[in-house]
C-alpha cells in the first residue's frame, strides 16, 4: 500500500472513529479499495482546438470561479478497460468528422464482466449518417454506443451493460442502465455486498429493503431470507431490479414502486396505493424482522426513522457520515450498534461510505 493511499484512508478512519465514538460501536471494520483502476465510470469533456481534440476535465482556480482546462490522456483511477479504450476511441473520433463534429462529452461505463458502453454527447442534431458511422465504430471497437443530443437519444446495441459478481458461491448478474445510479467502485461494491450478507446472517422472518435501486443488495440478501419486499421510487431502477430478479432466477423478492415515505403510509394503513394492488403485493402478508436501508445523501426522514425503530434489526449503508450520525441519534434510542464498517468506495476524495448493523436493545 502506498503512503498516499494509506494516509487518505487513515484520515477517513480517524474521522469516522471520532465522529461515532458516542455510540460506542464495536471495532471499525475497514474495507480498502484498489489504489488504481477502481472506477467503472468516467466522464470527460471533449476539448477542440484548431488542429487537435482531446479529453479534458476542469480544475477550479483558487478563487473558485475561474476554471482551468486540464488535458487528460490517461486516467489511472478508471478501470483498465477504460484506459485502454480512451486512445483508440479518440483516434477513431478524430479520423471521422461525422463523429467528432460538435462532440461535447464522452462518458464511459465499464464492467468487471468485460462490457463497455460509451455515450457520445453532441451540440448538434444526429442524423442517419452519424448512426451509420457510430455502428461501424461500435463494431470495430466491440463496444456499445449511445448518441445523445438535446431531445435525441440513439442507441447502438443497448443503453445498458450487464455486470457480474461472484458472491455466496454463485454468480449475480446486474443490468446497469446508462443514466441510472450504480456503485462506481465494483471491487469495493462486492465487499459491501458480502458485509451486508454477513450482517444478515442468522436473521429470521422477512426482509424489508428501502431505496433498493437496481437490486444491488437485494439479490444476494434474498438468499438469507424466506421473503423480501424491496421498495424504490425511480421507474428505471424498478425495471432494472425486476430484470435482475428474473435473470438471476430468484423467486422470493417483490419490488414495490414506492418512496420510503409512501411505504410508511401503506404499512401503517394510512393510505392505499393502486401500484401495490397492480403488482399483487400484500404488505400485511409479510412478517418483517430486518430492514435494510441505503438512503440518498440526505439520509432518512423522521417518519421513516420511527418506522425503523419497530424492527429487530436494521442494516444501514450510508454514503454520508453526517446524516448517518444524525439518524443514529434517533435509532440508538431503541437499538445498539453491533457492527460498524468503512468502505473506501471513493479513494482520494473526502467521501466516506459506511455500514452499521443495529439490533434492538
Swiss-Prot record:
Q: Name one GO cellular component term.
A: cytosol
PROSITE patterns reported for this sequence:
SAM_MT_RNA_M5U, TRMA_1, TRMA_2
What CDD domains has UniProt attached to this entry?
A: AdoMet_MTases
Any Pfam family hit: tRNA_U5-meth_tr
Annotated signal sequence range: none
Q: Where is the active site?
A: 319, 353
**NCBIfam families given in the database record:** trmA_only
Q: Quote the protein name from its UniProt record.
A: tRNA/tmRNA (uracil-C(5))-methyltransferase
What's the encoding gene here? trmA
Amino acid at each position: 500500500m502506498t503512503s498516499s493511499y494509506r494516509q487518505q484512508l487513515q484520515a477517513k478512519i480517524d474521522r469516522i472513529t471520532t465522529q461515532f465514538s458516542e455510540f460506542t460501536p464495536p471495532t471499525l471494520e475497514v474495507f480498502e479499495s484498489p489504489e488504481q483502476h477502481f472506477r467503472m465510470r468516467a466522464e470527460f469533456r471533449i476539448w477542440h482546438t484548431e488542429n487537435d481534440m482531446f479529453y479534458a476535465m476542469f480544475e477550479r482556480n483558487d478563487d473558485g470561479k475561474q476554471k482551468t482546462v486540464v488535458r487528460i490522456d490517461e486516467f489511472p483511477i478508471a478501470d483498465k478497460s477504460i484506459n485502454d479504450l480512451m486512445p483508440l476511441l479518440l483516434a477513431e473520433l478524430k479520423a471521422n468528422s461525422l463523429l467528432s463534429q460538435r462532440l461535447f462529452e464522452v462518458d464511459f461505463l465499464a464492467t468487471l464482466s468485460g462490457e463497455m458502453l460509451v455515450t457520445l454527447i453532441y451540440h448538434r442534431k444526429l442524423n442517419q449518417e452519424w448512426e451509420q458511422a457510430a455502428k461501424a465504430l461500435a463494431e470495430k471497437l466491440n463496444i456499445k454506443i449511445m448518441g445523445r443530443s438535446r431531445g435525441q437519444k440513439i442507441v447502438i446495441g443497448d443503453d445498458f451493460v450487464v455486470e457480474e459478481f461472484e458472491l455466496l458461491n454463485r454468480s449475480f448478474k446486474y443490468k446497469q442502465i446508462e443514466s441510472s445510479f450504480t456503485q462506481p467502485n465494483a471491487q469495493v461494491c462486492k465487499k459491501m455486498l458480502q458485509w451486508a450478507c454477513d450482517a444478515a446472517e442468522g436473521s429470521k422472518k422477512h426482509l424489508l429493503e428501502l431505496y433498493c435501486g437496481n437490486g444491488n443488495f437485494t439479490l444476494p440478501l434474498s438468499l438469507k431470507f424466506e421473503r423480501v419486499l424491496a421498495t424504490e421510487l425511480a421507474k428505471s431502477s424498478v425495471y432494472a431490479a425486476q430484470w435482475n430478479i428474473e435473470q438471476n432466477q430468484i423467486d422470493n423478492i417483490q419490488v414495490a414502486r414506492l418512496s420510503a415515505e409512501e411505504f410508511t403510509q401503506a404499512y401503517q394503513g394510512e393510505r392505499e396505493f393502486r401500484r401495490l394492488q397492480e403488482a399483487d403485493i400484500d404488505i400485511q402478508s409479510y412478517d418483517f424482522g430486518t430492514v435494510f436501508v441505503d438512503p440518498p445523501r440526505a439520509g432518512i426522514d423522521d417518519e421513516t426513522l420511527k418506522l425503523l425503530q419497530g424492527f429487530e434489526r436494521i442494516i444501514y449503508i450510508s454514503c454520508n457520515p453526517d446524516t448517518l450520525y444524525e439518524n443514529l441519534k434517533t435509532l440508538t434510542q431503541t437499538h445498539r450498534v453491533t457492527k460498524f464498517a468503512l468502505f473506501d468506495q471513493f479513494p482520494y476524495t473526502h467521501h466516506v461510505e459506511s455500514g452499521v448493523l443495529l439490533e434492538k436493545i
